Regions:
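Hydrophobic/small/kink-forming positions within alpha-helical transmembrane segments
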Residues: 22-26, 30, 62, 86-94, ...
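C-terminal transmembrane-helix exit sites in multi-pass transporters
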Residues: 96-101, 115-137
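Loop-to-transmembrane-helix transition segments
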Residues: 14-20, 71-95, 159-167, 212-234
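Structural motif at transmembrane-helix junctions in multi-pass transporters
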Residues: 41-48, 95-112, 183-188, 235-246
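Structural signature of hydrophobic alpha-helical transmembrane segments
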Residues: 45-59, 98-115, 157-170, 214-228
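Short, Lys/Arg-rich, polar N-terminal cytosolic tail immediately upstream
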Residues: 1-12
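Hydrophobic transmembrane alpha-helices of multi-pass small-molecule transport proteins
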Residues: 134-151
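Juxtamembrane helix-loop-helix junctions in multi-pass membrane proteins
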Residues: 24-56, 173-197
Length: 246
């Protein structure tokens, strides 16, 4: 099985990693949405929920790095590139979770589907990646699909729609920036600093919007953290081995 995987092209591996990352991200989001439902989607609870999840993420990914003997905190937490990328992820997470708390799950992901379209365009324009007519056709078909699902003629626009759109914009910035230093760091190292920065951002958010959650919800947050950790790792691996316009 491993030998077969090694023979695959980088683009094919990138597709597999992308599918896996989106699966882990979506499943993680479902758990967080489930927890938020206990509190009637009150965003005041977001800070503590995401902060606790972040602590679990840091511990889990940090444990992997420790086992691999690749956990150099001084190196990781003083890297300008990783901290900037992590900051982008933190801002993206804020907008995403505000959307998660105020929009139906399906609507949120439909709007987030704009991110791959924007990323493909940025890969061609900013990184000068070669994007042929087939890939541009896929971009246009994807955008058309988003419009069909959203159905603009019946959609009641509200302020909440701006949240996933801003999240999509920061996803684009994050991946474009990551591509510029892709080979300098291990995917798990990037995922660790990403988890750290998101935790810091929501720790600050929690200071101004704190509401205690129930201990019973910690289990769901823990499962969410494991899923998110793998999502981070595969998302970084995707950008490292394939063109971001993929």
């Amino acid at each position: 099985m491993i030998q077969y995987f090694d023979k695959l092209s980088l683009e094919t591996k990138g597709i597999i990693f992308m599918i896996l990352s989106q699966f882990f991200f979506a499943t993680n989001d479902a758990f967080i949405k489930h927890v938020l439902a206990f509190y009637k989607n009150d965003t005041s609870y977001l800070g503590e929920i995401v902060f606790i999840r972040g602590v679990f993420v840091i511990f889990f990914i940090g444990l992997i790095l420790f086992i691999k003997k690749n956990l150099d905190l001084k190196f990781l937490l003083t890297s300008k590139h990783l901290l900037i990328r992590g900051g982008m992820e933190g801002i993206c997470a804020i907008f995403f979770f505000l959307g998660l708390a105020t929009l139906p799950f399906g609507d949120l992901y439909v709007l987030l589907n704009l991110a791959p379209i924007i990323i493909t365009a940025s890969g061609a324009i900013l990184l000068k990646e070669k994007v042929g007519w087939r890939r541009w056709s896929a971009v246009l078909m994807g955008f058309t699909g988003v419009l069909i699902v959203i159905n603009p003629t019946k959609l009641e626009f509200g302020f909440a729609f701006i949240f996933p759109l801003l999240a999509a914009a920061f996803i684009t910035l994050r991946d474009t920036y990551t591509k510029k230093f892709e080979q300098r760091y291990d995917s798990i190292q990037v995922a660790f600093v990403t988890g750290f920065m998101v935790t810091v951002v929501f720790g600050i958010y929690m200071l101004f919007h704190f509401k205690a959650i129930k201990l019973d919800d910690i289990f769901y947050i823990f499962i969410s953290a494991i899923l998110l950790s793998f999502g981070y790792i595969f998302a970084v691996a995707t950008v490292k081995i394939a063109t971001i316009s993929l």
